Curated annotation (Swiss-Prot):
Keyword Transmembrane applies: no
The organism's place on the tree of life at top rank: Viruses
GO molecular function, one term: DNA-binding transcription factor activity
Protein name, UniProt field: Regulatory protein E2
Gene Ontology CC annotation, any one: host cell nucleus
Post-translational modification: Phosphorylated.
Gene: E2
Amino acid sequence: MEAIAKRLDACQEQLLELYEENSTDLHKHVLHWKCMRHESVLLYKAKQMGLSHIGMQVVPPLKVSEAKGHNAIEMQMHLESLLRTEYSMEPWTLQETSYEMWQTPPKRCFKKRGKTVEVKFDGCANNTMDYVVWTDVYVQDNDTWVKVHSMVDAKGIYYTCGQFKTYYVNFVKEAEKYGSTKHWEVCYGSTVICSPASVSSTTQEVSIPESTTYTPAQTSTLVSSSTKEDAVQTPPRKRARGVQQSPCNALCVAHIGPVDSGNHNLITNNHDQHQRRNNSNSSATPIVQFQGESNCLKCFRYRLNDRHRHLFDLISSTWHWASSKAPHKHAIVTVTYDSEEQRQQFLDVVKIPPTISHKLGFMSLHLL
């Protein structure tokens, strides 16, 4: 058990260093998936040995470790293949090389710089769906990679590789799901495309304007609700299709609501760290909520317990909002402090990886 624990600690330490580095070098992302593969192997072996915990970490079921290991092998192989092309010189983020992005339509393709397309069904302003058009789509064709662009027409969203046109969003099928009249309107920038009487008729094609694309690095940490065009990493308020939240997508953060509904006036954010507690709520405990991909938070929590245990009081396991109205699907870790001074000392000393975001707040003592 000690040998597995030491190897797992070393593996997770390397993972956290990669998250903190937040590199755009494709070689680093290949290394990231090698570490993920190694971690899955160790956890799988630990479960076979009958272990339920390794230190403070729960050992997942065999099926979970096996599935994650298969995903890691798949990503490692495709990234190593991409590494042998001219596209390896381009900047790549953790999110762009994540398994969640790999499975986002169009599936099993790498993609960058997405733009939102709004589709209105039955002419009803309240019945809309958002889809994503990707400026760059990297498609594997005969053991090589080709970079193509998404296009929009009245039938759907597609890319063309060679002589083949591949639709990854079909508006006819979407209209059957979300509408009743089989009528839809595609709103893309200043262009509006209406559903034709016969979908097989000549349709208008729209390419992506280079000047209006978004990248993960351009996404602000706090997103204003009045923004007209959301970045791909930020789920819009309406129902969305074609965009999944990325595994290390903490670069873009939805606003966290109050932790204690009785203390709405106590919640602070990154842009107001000097706000103090209301005198009438002196029993509230200072907290920090960290958001990010589950594995990032798990490694971060391990480092906090190992190196900075004197800088906080309690730390939670990773948790998620279960409601369908949840503002995001990130994992969350909550840390409590004895005082605001201790919390500030924590923030001054601890290096928080750029792939993990945080919010300040307070929690009533009776909740702890």
